[in-house]
Regions:
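Glycine-rich, mobile lid/loop segments that gate access to catalytic sites or pores
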Residues: 1-37
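A short beta-alpha structural unit
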Residues: 74-77, 114-123, 164
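Short glycine/threonine-rich loop-to-helix capping motif typified by GTGT followed
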Residues: 83-88, 120-143, 154, 206-212
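Phosphate/pyrophosphate-binding loops at sites that engage ATP/ADP/AMP, CoA/4′-phosphopantetheine
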Residues: 98-112, 187
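A glycine-biased, small/acidic residue-tolerant capping/turn segment at secondary-structure junctions
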Residues: 136-148, 188-193
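Structural signal for terminal/edge beta-strands and the immediately following C-terminal loop/tail
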Residues: 161-169, 182-186, 190-212
Length: 212
């Protein structure tokens, strides 16, 4: 419930978010089951929308209208391929390999991260990604997020636009677009105080494909 409530807190400050009405933990628990252990607010919405991204060289970016956001590292992980064989491990995901690769390429660790923009088709996806990136140990994601750590004013601002759960569901473009907004310092009311390092993630299949 903490992830759903946190996302909604961020979404109330995002003029582009679809769900901007505050959500309490009591309302979360009172919502109907979709498939246990997932309540209604554990699951993302379905909506129409569009996001555009311009990718170019650092030299060319200096001449463009918007301040550039530099990609320091990237990685991907594919522990399973449902087209070839079933992937039944719902605990370890491609985020572990993708995160290690991206952070190593950038020369940073999780201790250096200012803000996270994570793929969150379900609240569980946020939790397991934080675990696999190394922000906490495996199995400790629930307690890690329970104290408002991801919410406004928390130690690790996460999905600051409301994520896919409360803002808009545009697949991997949701975290990417908000990461760019935060890194540029254009988040307005929801802008993170520190925003030098903002990883974004994307997830595919039943947790078996991940990009960082």
């Amino acid at each position: 419930g903490a992830v759903a409530v946190s996302n909604r807190q961020w979404a109330t400050m995002n003029p582009h978010a679809i769900y901007r009405t505050p959500l309490t933990i009591e309302e979360y628990h009172a919502s109907r089951w979709i498939a246990e252990p997932f309540h209604l607010f554990d699951c993302t919405m379905v909506n129409n929308g569009a996001v555009a991204v311009v990718v170019t060289s650092a030299e060319r970016a200096r001449d463009m209208a918007q301040p550039p956001v530099h990609v320091l590292g990237m990685g991907q992980g594919h522990p399973g391929n449902p087209k070839k064989a079933p992937f039944e491990n719902e605990v370890n995901t491609g985020a572990a390999q993708a995160g290690r690769t991206a952070f190593a390429m950038a020369g940073v660790t999780v201790a250096d991260i200012d803000i996270c923009e994570l793929y969150d088709c379900y609240t569980y996806t946020t939790i397991v990604t934080l675990e696999d990136y190394g922000f906490c140990e495996k199995g400790e994601g629930g307690p890690f997020v329970a104290d408002g750590r991801l919410a406004p004013g928390g130690a690790l601002p996460t999905n600051t636009g409301g994520g896919q759960l409360s803002s808009y569901y545009m697949w991997g473009m949701t975290p990417l677009s908000e990461a760019v907004i935060q890194a540029r310092g254009q988040g307005g009311e929801r802008q993170g105080e520190k925003h030098d390092l903002v990883p974004g993630s994307s997830q595919g299949g039943p947790l078996d494909h991940h990009g960082t």
